[in-house]
Regions:
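Non-catalytic alpha-helical coupling and interface elements of nucleotide-dependent molecular machines
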Residues: 20, 36-40, 68, 77, ...
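Structured binding elements
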Residues: 96, 188-193
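Interfacial helix-loop-helix hairpins and adjacent transmembrane helices
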Residues: 154, 184-187, 213-225
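Extracytoplasmic/periplasmic membrane-proximal domains and adjacent transmembrane bundles
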Residues: 1-70, 79, 150-152
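Helix-termination/interfacial motifs at the ends of transmembrane alpha-helices
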Residues: 64, 182-190
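Hydrophobic transmembrane alpha-helices and their membrane-interface caps
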Residues: 73-159, 165-184, 198, 202, ...
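Alpha-helical transmembrane segments of integral membrane proteins
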Residues: 65-68, 115-121, 191-194
Length: 225
């Protein structure tokens, strides 16, 4: 060869691969399984995966720190808004409502959990929490105005149905072209769009149907306490 590369005093040979039409993480996982099954490296040789895959692994490691901090920040802001740990915890429950849909969205789109998908989850949680705040804050206001629990829940869901649906619908419709794109960059846009669209479907439905029930249960527990 025209050049012998070394790293840490050892010879190094770089094999480059261009991945097109599928996600990088899934390709590397499949390649690792095939190499482990069919290739036996001689003594003194080792194999490392670098390039974009290494960068993706580093980004995922950072996201594993950022995501818990994001959830804590959301909880803190909710507590500052409502001055109640119970209501903050109640609205935080929309996160699993949204995450369920996001996971199913990745599955049905044939995508894997990647950096774009993780960013999609963070965006999704923000929209889902916003819808939860819109609904619960109005129900809480009705209760303070003297409405009974049943009246507050019925009026709250009825009057906040359109704002919640509009917020979710606009976000979903804006991402539809990204979900069905197939050109360069689609490996980044498709996972993000799949997570947000599917997550908003489940979070919106469960926010309107389940969150009022949980609000009643939380308030009854507070009265008992």
């Amino acid at each position: 060869p025209a050049q012998i590369s070394r790293e840490s005093g050892r010879r190094r040979l770089v094999v480059g691969v261009n991945v097109e039409g599928r996600d990088l993480g899934g390709f590397v996982k499949e390649a690792q399984e095939l190499i482990a099954k069919n290739v036996e490296l001689p003594q003194g040789y080792n194999l490392q995966w670098g390039g974009q895959f290494e960068n993706m692994q580093r980004a995922m490691a950072r996201l594993m720190i950022i995501i818990p901090l994001t959830i804590l920040a959301i909880f803190f802001l909710l507590f500052m808004l409502f001055k109640s740990l119970r209501l903050a915890a109640l609205i935080i429950l929309v996160l699993p409502f949204a995450s369920i849909g996001g996971v199913f969205g990745l599955f049905f789109a044939g995508e894997y959990l990647s950096v774009p998908a993780a960013v999609g989850f963070i965006n999704l949680w923000g929209i889902a929490v916003l819808n939860g705040v819109v609904l619960i804050s109005f129900i809480k206001q009705l209760r303070e105005d003297g409405y009974s629990m049943e009246e507050a829940l019925l009026h709250g869901c009825g009057h906040r149905f359109r704002p919640v649906m509009m917020t979710a619908s606009v976000a979903m419709l804006a991402l539809v072209p990204m979900l069905f794109s197939g050109g360069p960059g689609s490996e980044v846009t498709r996972p993000l769009a799949a997570v947000v669209i599917a997550g908003l479907i489940t979070s919106t439905a469960l926010t309107l149907l389940v969150l009022p029930v949980l609000y009643r249960w939380f308030e009854e527990k507070e009265v008992e306490a």
